Amino acid sequence: MPSSFVSQLSPSLFSILREQLEKKGFTISIPPHTVFQGRSPTVSCTVYQSGKIVVQGKGTQEFVEFFLEPEILQTFSSQNVQQDLRSRIGVDESGKGDFFGPLCTAGVYASSPQAIEALYKTSICDSKLIPDAKILSLAQNIRSLCACKVITLFPEKYNALYANFQNLNSLLAWTHATIIDNLAPHPAGAVFAISDQFASSERVLLQAVRKKCSDIELIQRHRAEQDVVVAAASILAREAFLSSIHALESQYQIRLLKGASGKVKQRAKEILHNKGQVVLEKVCKTHFKTFNEVLGSGNQ
């Protein structure tokens, strides 16, 4: 599919689509001649007063195939996806861009064509396109089909490890390599691993994997979440992130926000004021510039 999509939307669906986009974290605005426009880091969805809907951006295919068509338009013209049934390990993470909460890395080992076919039938896709309410049930399905491994680094542990690695990509490479080594058969044989290329050089992850699992083939690509097994891993990572956020909220009796927006910064200031720096450090990633900005404002 090209990086744009045009269709017609019934006025009765305008509010439904807007509500779903808001739940997914899209930023909503109302440019001239539109009903509304929703934007995420990878896709924009514009609904015009005429009913025309235009989707643009590098995330267009996933957005249309896994959300817009099946859930809003109730059509399925894009779902004839060629299925890759090769046994493989998919790895993905959640939380690296969130000021509050842990870094969660998950791996899924789909060891048979039957398991992979079942993942396709479950409509697995990138977790960023799935409402949080659906994540839990999808994660349960994935665990029933495949071998899985999740590493959750709560802020206290994450901050200590980051101080050691001094680089987020190096820390990510370590968690990814640990997951792959844990799930991979030894010898790996025909099984390979696939991951998003999160560093500018493929060597960062490759070297980490080679230290632990010398014989497995590693494939790195941008937008690896388009692979169904990597997408399954992204769902498990997201599930771990959401459950960990809830655990931190319960432990410290605070409300945490996702992302790293101005609202997140304001919430951090409130936590610093009400709970103190010790608690703030236990619920956030202290290498974010937001942390020092919040501390600075607290000392004024």
From Swiss-Prot:
InterPro entries: RNase_HII/HIII, RNase_HII/HIII_dom, RNase_HIII, RNase_HIII_N, RNaseH-like_sf, RNaseH_sf, TBP_dom_sf. Keywords: Cytoplasm, Endonuclease, Hydrolase, Magnesium, Metal-binding, Nuclease. It holds the Pfam family DUF3378. A divalent metal cation binds at residues 92-93, 196. It comes from the Bacteria. Belongs to the RNase HII family. RnhC subfamily. Endonuclease that specifically degrades the RNA of RNA-DNA hybrids. This is Ribonuclease HIII. It comes from Chlamydia trachomatis serovar D (strain ATCC VR-885 / DSM 19411 / UW-3/Cx).
